[in-house]
From Swiss-Prot:
Tissues showing expression: Expressed in nurse cells at stages 9-10 of oogenesis and exported to the oocyte.
Keyword Transmembrane: no
GO cellular component: condensed nuclear chromosome; CURI complex; nucleolus; small-subunit processome; UTP-C complex
Keywords: Chromosome, Nucleus, Phosphoprotein, RNA-binding
Protein name, UniProt field: Nucleolar protein 6
Source taxon at top rank: Eukaryota
Residues carrying Phosphoserine: S35
Principal location class: nucleus
Residue span of region Disordered: 1-69, 1137-1193
Function: Part of the small subunit (SSU) processome, first precursor of the small eukaryotic ribosomal subunit. During the assembly of the SSU processome in the nucleolus, many ribosome biogenesis factors, an RNA chaperone and ribosomal proteins associate with the nascent pre-rRNA and work in concert to generate RNA folding, modifications, rearrangements and cleavage as well as targeted degradation of pre-ribosomal RNA by the RNA exosome.
PANTHER family on file: NUCLEOLAR PROTEIN 6, NUCLEOLAR RNA-ASSOCIATED PROTEIN
Lineage, top ranks: Eukaryota, Metazoa, Ecdysozoa, Arthropoda, Hexapoda
């Protein structure tokens, strides 16, 4: 169903594999024809007389081209059987097959790699032994002293391919070929295992080889850079980009320097040994104490020493096994899309390759397993195998005691073929658990028969930052040095060879894990790959910056209390609690009588947005209390975008007459429960009304606020003035009455009776409940506690009468039409969907606030309900929360908003039907039938198709239409979402930039509009939500006057403009208090002269030669006429920019004619000082009280 674009595939794999879809149809057709083709046909002997019997009609007519079709071969039958047994759909199998075909390396790259390796082998044979005295290159490592007297020994072994190039699993688009060059044993001495001597010699050896290569004419034009492998400063590698047309800079060669395993004594680098002495860093160590183990440094050296043996075993396992190679390719795509393989602590693809061999040796994977079986088995075993206890690939069996001893020194333990090196030495526990969770999710997606899981597993890019709820960034160099100096344990310093990053990671992870406890699910390092640098420059200092992502536990993250041990029962525990929390800890007495140490972070009455900052409070306090790190030196990202649905600071709450405890910092999310409680009380009063002709059996709130999806703050400020209710917003309520057979059968009479019934309800409410009410064209307006409710009456007979049509023959038929669909959606389907979304918010507390961010973003991009329906936004966000896109549910609205942008950016709207199966109301067959109908009749569905399980026969066509949103608007929104994601990702992953300000995302660009119509600001009330500014003009004095309830004049006028002039212009405005209307003209062909036709005269004017033409000037006059009193003036964006550049107040308050006169340049008048002949100095310009605002006086 869904083909989402990816960013890692070479070739044509950027969208839906059309070939796969066609192949799938053909394969299914062949599978269905096998039974007929296998049956032998009876032969008629020549001597037999012709049969006179009437032959039976063959319902399955044979095509002309299939008369000589051969029966399926054994291989085809096996493939069909595998499809039925392994894949839950033929489509999934075809998609996998198509992707693997696209991933296969082209022959030109294979040839180039072979030729380059031969050339490099010949080059190494020409190298000569010698003393390395001087070099014009910089050694890619921070050396303790300048290199003197390093003797270069010619390599005795030919260079060889390692990694993906050796196993045949290279993955684009940037093809990286890893080559190993073994440093001979003679280059190393007996004591080189100590104090980074081996690493320094390795770096010098790499520098020498690089210098000789640059002198060689074979590599003279190539580009040479150094880089750190896996962000490890002890692992410099040479990155060479060949300059040749054959590979066109799409290929890169990385040169690794290794050493033979026999270079040092066996057991020298076991995890419990020490190979970095404290004296190396100038530290003192008591000789009586055992030296601390340096397991991570030892594993770093063993990576080089065991590389040859490990690669030989991998080559043996993967050679000529296309199934293993393709399976590993699938796993690499899955891993890279989740960005779990980046950096020092990354889960590399070489680990997956070794795990495939491990499963094969354990007889869990077989040599005949398909690529899909390989990937699925690896995911299943990853999810269900615990590596923290240790697993081993060693050819020689390892005793359980020794394996346990290995595992004690690492978070994760996977022993290699030699039995000496831990492949997962640098992987922290939280990241390993994350890999397991992602693997478990992949298996669950594969097992879901209702879902096309292919795009979710392989095609959808899921960067790690979009999977976390909060992010902690520390980038101040001096602060990090201070933390490492004062708080990093010497044992950790020696273990990581004084590399700062893993020390920081260990220090912060342990502290936050203890402080946050059950509030946090995972603490993940967010890394970016280090950038390469020219070989002539010094190696950069890395590791002085860290970024951690926190995945929160929604059930516990926002608790306001940390309760410690009882002071009387556990004195030591209470003392430890006070020491850990510092001054925040206090002795408190609780309602159950217990007296314990406790830390309070807020109150139960705090708003949800404030509670979401509790984790932030805890983290900053821990950093300050334990690490002396000031909050100004830390960037904690979590809740920055909540500002966009806060109450405008221009509106003063203290002037509002209400009994509700409202603060100036309140927001739309915190105000929603007040409205819901008022609605619940109104519902009880309606149910309790006496003497009604019919009983009220159902009351449903259908406005967005009843499902926590209203982005504009709703305050209790509605008023009754001269029998009119003034309110900034109304809340819609639908009621249904008990059954009665006395309702009229004529539509007008039925609606009149409905009106009379609503008046009766209003009178009863006034008499029995003392509520004010006003009857309007849309329903009964009721004023209660400062809120305005619009009560509508639903009746089944009205819907039937709207569908009723009488044919020419007098036959009554019932046919759906736009009016009946609208009524059915509003009165019968929306109440059910609204209830389901309300329940979803109760399950996932971040749902409502995510919708608020999404709606505010779309509104600030000048997309109103006429271009993009609000319900479409709510249902798309609900789709995010319903589907298993990530192992954990979204706990922070900011994360939900980022995933919403990803959904808009990467979805194939033309190929996907967004299904919301509330309460599992749909059966599996119903979903399959709907998807089949969607695929076969795609043209009958709108561009954005969303279906819920309550839509009945309107599924996919009820919440959106062909024009809302149109294909163009969908493309526009997709581009906007991609741009917003680029801004967010750049700010998140940058070391220097701070997180985006809301105005960077929630303010539209002023580019691309032809004209801007400005409204009179005193007639257009401002939104109560936080004003982030207009894209066209600067801020102005806000207008919070209350309009007549339900009178959204601007929306109605824009609707009229679209209905009349959408063929000639597109209209954009911000529905949340926008005071400008952006206009984009259609292409010039719409305004070209055309022959006179009676049916095509709309907005046309005669232009001679019996032709007519649409004139933009005439259209503008029509626009002014429709806008009437709201129109102020029309300007181009360029004119508005020019006014702002000239530091003039944008002309929003005055008449356009006067504005034009005042905008003309006037000669400057200079005053003279009294008593002197000198001219007085001109007054300084004041922007607020400029001459252009005198019209207001």
């Amino acid at each position: 169903m869904r083909f989402v674009q990816g960013n890692i595939m070479p070739g044509k794999l950027v969208g839906s594999p059309k070939g796969a879809a066609r192949t799938g149809t053909q394969a299914i057709a062949h599978a269905g024809d096998h039974s007929d083709l296998d049956e032998p046909k009876p032969k008629i002997a020549k001597s037999d007389p012709p049969s006179t019997a009437i032959p039976k009609k063959n319902n399955f007519k044979q095509r002309e081209g299939t008369k000589n079709v051969k029966p399926p071969t054994l291989e085809e039958m096996k493939e069909l059987r595998d499809t039925q047994n392994l894949f839950h759909s033929n489509l999934f199998k075809l998609q996998v097959k198509e992707m693997l075909e696209e991933l296969q390396l082209k022959q030109k790259y294979t040839d180039f790699i072979e030729n380059w390796l031969e050339s490099f082998t010949a080059f190494t044979r020409q190298l000569k032994d010698g003393l390395m005295e001087r070099t014009h290159l910089e050694v890619p490592m921070k050396l303790s002293e300048k290199p003197t007297g390093f003797v270069f020994s010619k390599p005795t072994r030919e260079p060889y391919l390692i990694g993906a190039a050796a196993t045949g699993t290279l993955l684009g688009p940037k093809i990286v070929v890893d080559v190993a060059l073994e440093m001979p044993k003679e280059s190393l001495h007996k004591e080189d295992y100590l104090n980074l001597r081996y690493d320094q010699k390795r770096a010098l050896y790499l520098t020498y080889v690089t210098e000789r290569m640059m002198e060689s004419p074979d590599y003279a034009e190539d580009q040479f850079n150094f880089n750190y492998y896996a962000n490890n400063p002890l692992k410099p590698v040479l990155e060479l980009i060949p300059v040749t047309k054959q590979v066109n800079k799409h290929l890169q060669v990385r040169l690794f320097i290794t050493a033979p395993l026999s270079s040092f004594k066996p057991g020298r680098f076991v995890p419990w040994n020490n190979n970095i002495r404290p004296s190396f860093y100038g530290d003192e160590w008591d000789e009586k104490d055992p030296l601390p183990s340096t397991q991570h440094y030892n594993a770093n050296v063993l990576f080089d020493l065991t590389l040859s043996e490990n690669q030989a075993q991998l080559d043996k396992a993967f050679k000529s096994r296309r199934n293993f190679q393709d399976g590993l390719l699938l796993l690499k795509v899955w891993l890279r899309q989740r960005q779990l393989d980046i950096g020092y602590s990354g889960f590399g693809a070489h680990i997956l390759a070794a795990f495939i061999v491990y499963l094969n040796t354990q007889r869990i994977l077989h040599q005949s397993s398909s690529s899909y079986q390989v990937a699925r088995t690896v995911w299943n075993q990853l999810a269900n195998t615990d590596w923290t206890k240790g697993i081993s690939l060693s050819v020689a069996p390892i005793q359980t005691e020794e394996l346990n001893k290995f595992a004690e020194h690492y978070d994760v333990c996977f022993i290699d073929f030699t039995g000496q090196h831990n492949l997962c030495a640098n992987i922290p526990l939280y990241l390993y658990q994350r890999v397991r969770e992602e693997a478990k999710l992949a298996v669950e997606l594969l097992n879901d028969m209702k879902l096309n899981s292919f795009p979710l597993i392989f095609m959808q890019k899921c960067p790690l930052y979009s999977r976390v709820d909060n992010i902690l960034k520390i980038s101040n160099y001096s602060c990090i040095n201070q933390m490492l100096t004062l708080h990093s344990h010497p044992r950790i310093k020696y273990d990581f060879a004084n590399y700062g990053y893993p020390q920081l990671l260990h220090l912060l992870t342990e502290l936050l894990k203890k402080g946050l406890a059950e509030r946090v699910h995972s603490i993940l390092p967010l890394e970016t790959a280090t950038a390469a640098w020219p070989v002539e420059k010094k190696a950069p200092v890395i590791g002085k910056y860290i970024q951690l992502g926190l995945i929160l536990q929604p059930e516990h993250a926002y608790q306001v209390l940390n309760k410690g041990p009882a002071a009387n029962d556990d004195h030591e525990g209470a003392e430890e609690f006070r020491r850990f929390w510092g001054e925040k800890s206090n002795l408190r007495r609780f309602q159950d009588g217990s007296i314990t140490e406790a830390v309070v972070w807020g109150t139960a009455q705090d708003s949800p947005a404030k509670k979401r900052l509790i984790v932030r409070q805890i983290v900053l306090h821990l950093l300050e209390h334990h690490l002396q790190l000031d909050s100004k030196e830390v960037q904690y990202i979590g809740g920055e975008l909540d500002q966009v649905y806060q109450l405008s600071p221009w509106f003063k709450v203290n002037k509002l007459k209400t009994k509700l405890p409202l603060g100036q910092d309140t927001d739309a999310e915190a105000l929603s429960p007040h409205v819901i409680r008022c609605y619940d009380e109104l519902a009880r009063q309606l149910h309790g009304l006496n003497d009604l002709p019919l009983e009220i059996v159902s009351i449903s709130g259908v406005s967005p606020i009843f499902r926590y999806c209203e982005p504009q703050p709703v305050l209790p400020q509605a008023l009754l003035v001269e029998n009119r209710i003034l309110a900034s917003s109304i809340q819609r309520v639908v009621i249904q009455l008990g059954q009665s057979g006395k309702w009229p059968t004529e539509l007008g009479a039925l609606r009149a009776l409905k009106t009379a019934f609503l008046i009766e309800i209003g009178e009863k409410l006034e008499a029995q409940c003392r509520l004010h009410w006003v009857m309007s064209a849309d329903g009964l307006l009721v004023l209660k506690q400062g809120y305005c409710f619009l009560i509508e009456l639903a009746h089944n007979k009205e819907l039937a009468l709207l569908k009723q049509e009488v044919t020419e023959r007098g036959i009554t038929t019932y046919i759906d039409n736009a009016a009946s669909r609208s009524l059915e959606r509003q009165h019968y389907i929306l109440p059910k969907v609204s209830g389901a979304l309300h329940s979803l918010h109760q399950t996932y507390s971040a749902f409502g606030s995510t919708v608020l961010l999404a709606k505010r973003w779309l509104a600030t991009q000048l997309l109103d309900d006429g271009l993009w329906p609000d319900m479409a936004t709510e249902l798309l966000v609900a789709h995010l929360f319903q589907q298993r896109y990530a192992p954990q549910s979204i706990a922070a609205p900011q994360t939900g908003f980022i995933r919403f942008l990803q959904l808009l950016s990467h979805s194939d709207f033309n190929g996907e039907l967004f299904l919301l199966n509330f309460n599992n109301s749909w059966q599996e067959q119903q979903i399959a039938d709907l998807e089949h109908n969607y695929r076969s009749n795609r043209q009958s569905y709108p561009p954005l198709a969303v279906a819920t399980s309550y839509d009945m026969q309107h599924a996919g066509r009820l919440w959106t239409s062909d024009q809302s949103p149109s294909q163009r608007v969908l493309g526009h929104v997709t581009r906007l979402a991609r741009h917003a994601l680029e801004i967010i990702e750049t700010s998140l992953m940058s070391k220097d930039l701070r997180f985006v300000r809301p105005a960077q995302l929630f303010r539209a660009s002023n580019e691309g509009y032809d004209l801007v119509i400005q409204f009179k600001p005193d007639l257009v009330p401002n939104s109560l939500s936080y004003d982030l500014g207009s894209p066209f003009v600067s801020f102005s004095q806000p207008n919070f006057s209350l309009p007549r309830a339900g009178s959204d004049y601007i929306a109605r006028i824009v609707g009229l403009l679209r209905s009349a002039y959408s063929d000639f212009a597109a209209f954009f405005y911000n529905p949340h208090g926008g005071k400008e209307l952006g206009i984009v003209w259609r292409p010039p062909t719409e305004f070209a002269a055309k022959p006179f036709k009676v049916t095509e005269l709309q907005a046309c004017s005669p232009c001679g030669n019996k032709k007519v033409q649409v004139l933009k000037e005439t259209l503008l006059e029509d626009f002014k006429l429709l806008l009437k009193d709201f129109y102020l003036r029309i300007a181009t964006p360029e004119e508005l920019k020019r006014e702002q550049r000239e530091h003039q107040k944008p002309m929003r308050y005055f008449d356009a004619n006067k504005a034009e006169e005042e905008s003309k340049p006037k000669p400057k008048k200079h005053r003279q000082r009294k008593g002197t002949g000198k001219k007085a100095l001109p007054k300084r310009k004041r922007l607020i009280k400029s001459s252009t605002l005198k019209v207001l006086k």
